[in-house]
A protein has these predicted regions:
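Alpha-helical scaffold domains
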Residues: 1-140
Length: 140
C-alpha cells in the first residue's frame, strides 16, 4: 500500500530500537521507527494532497505496523467533521493496542463539542477493551 511505503521510507532504525524499549507489548518487527512529527506531517499532507487515499486508509483495519496506527489516529485528529471524527474514532478504538497510540490520539474538534463527546466517553468507559477505557479517561 502506498501509505505504508511512505512510512517505510521514513524509517529510522535507532529510533525503532528506542521505541521498541518503550512499548514492549508490541513486537519489534511491527515497529518501523518513524518519529511522531514526521507522522503528523504525513497525515496533514495526505489529507490535503491525497484525501481519497487517506480516507481509504481509515477504512482498512487492522493495521500491521505501530506507525500505521499512529498515522491513522493523526489523520482522524485532523478531520473537521465532528460526526466523521466520532465515527472513525469509534471504529478505531478496538484496534489500539498500546499506551503510546492511545495517548497521542487527541482530535482537536472534541474541544468544540464537549457535551456530545461526553456521551461517547461514557460509552467508551464501559468497554472491555483496556485502551478504549484508557482513551476515554484521557479525553475527560
Amino acid at each position: 500500500m502506498f501509505i505504508t511505503e511512505r512510512l517505510l521510507a521514513l524509517a529510522d532504525i535507532p529510533y525503532r530500537d528506542f521505541t521498541a524499549k518503550l512499548i514492549p507489548t508490541i513486537d519489534k518487527k511491527r515497529i518501523i521507527g518513524v518519529r511522531t512529527p514526521a507522522m503528523r506531517s504525513l497525515a496533514k499532507e495526505l489529507l490535503k494532497q491525497q484525501p481519497k487515499e487517506a480516507m481509504t486508509f481509515l477504512e482498512k483495519l487492522p493495521h500491521y505496523y505501530y506507525e500505521e496506527n499512529n498515522l491513522h489516529a493523526f489523520i482522524i485528529a485532523q478531520l473537521k467533521d465532528f460526526e466523521k471524527v466520532i465515527q472513525y474514532t469509534t471504529q478505531f478504538l478496538p484496534y489500539i493496542d498500546n499506551w503510546a497510540t492511545c495517548d497521542t490520539f487527541a482530535p482537536k474538534i472534541f474541544l468544540k463539542y464537549p457535551d456530545e463527546v461526553l456521551s461517547y466517553v461514557l460509552k467508551w468507559l464501559k468497554s472491555n477493551e483496556t485502551y478504549t477505557v484508557r482513551y476515554a479517561i484521557g479525553v475527560l
